[in-house]
């Protein structure tokens, strides 16, 4: 239905993440999917919102560049940016890396694979990252057409080469796919296991804070970790989608802390 509506409005869109990844699995139904993600052009946001609401979709959340719509129990995440924290080339020109059948777009495999690594880096930084994210990489490496040299060209543009080599080494260690870059990944592997299968659903935020502090050479303190969970600094807050209003306005940090607490407990 969504595809038909977007085509009727002549709005190009790209389906990505779970709805595409599940087709690479031997049994697509085995790849759990909490929502359907589509990318649209920013200038079509208003038209799409009006179109979906007039056709029975409820707009349940507006979160910066992401609008959530629900119909018949299915959640659709409509994005106007592919990944906010890396809104530079190549990700800011995502439509240039897709092939279209009419208005229906699909990313080139190597670009989509690169996006998954960048998306994982975002999860490591803010939410926690589960083993499922590594499994997605393994399945794509096994079944899709991945140009790893091109992947690292894309990662280099957003300064994620080291992270890419780390997660591909973990992928090799866990599932026998990927590459062994002779990196010590024991701490990363433990972190992933502590976060569980899905990461964001079973997220252990204390683990996330501990990892960051150890990476920065700080002595881990449970009390200070709890404070940092409640009151993250400005540079972290401005990267959270629902607190984008603070970007460029550091004097609003007190309001942002309060808003964040209310948002997460509403």
Model-derived features with residue positions:
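Conserved NTP-donor binding/palm subdomain of two-metal-ion nucleotidyltransferases/polymerases, i.e.
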Residues: 1-34, 40-266
């Amino acid at each position: 239905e969504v595809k038909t509506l977007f085509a009727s409005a002549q709005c190009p869109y790209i389906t990505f993440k779970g709805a595409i990844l599940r087709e690479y699995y031997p049994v697509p139904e085995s790849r759990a999917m909490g929502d359907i993600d589509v990318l649209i052009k920013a200038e079509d946001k208003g038209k799409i919102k009006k179109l979906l609401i007039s056709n029975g979709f409820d707009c349940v959340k507006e979160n910066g560049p992401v609008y959530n719509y629900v119909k018949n129990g299915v959640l659709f995440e409509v994005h106007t940016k592919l990944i906010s924290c890396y809104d530079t080339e190549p990700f800011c020109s995502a439509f240039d890396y897709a092939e279209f059948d009419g208005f229906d777009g699909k990313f080139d495999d190597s670009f989509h694979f690169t996006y998954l690594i960048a998306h994982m880096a975002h999860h490591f930084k803010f939410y926690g990252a589960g083993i499922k994210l590594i499994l997605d990489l393994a399945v794509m490496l096994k079944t899709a057409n991945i140009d790893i040299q091109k992947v690292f060209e894309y990662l280099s543009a957003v300064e994620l080469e080291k992270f890419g080599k780390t997660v591909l080494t973990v992928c090799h260690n866990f599932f026998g796919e990927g590459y062994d870059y002779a990196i010590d990944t024991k701490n990363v592997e433990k972190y992933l296991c502590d976060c569980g299968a899905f990461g964001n659903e079973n997220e252990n935020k204390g683990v996330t804070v501990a990892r960051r502090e150890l990476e920065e050479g700080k002595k881990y303190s449970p009390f200070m970790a709890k404070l940092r969970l409640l009151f993250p600094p400005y540079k972290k807050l401005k990267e959270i989608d629902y607190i984008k209003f603070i970007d460029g306005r550091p004097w609003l940090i007190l309001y942002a802390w309060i808003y964040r607490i209310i948002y997460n407990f509403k």
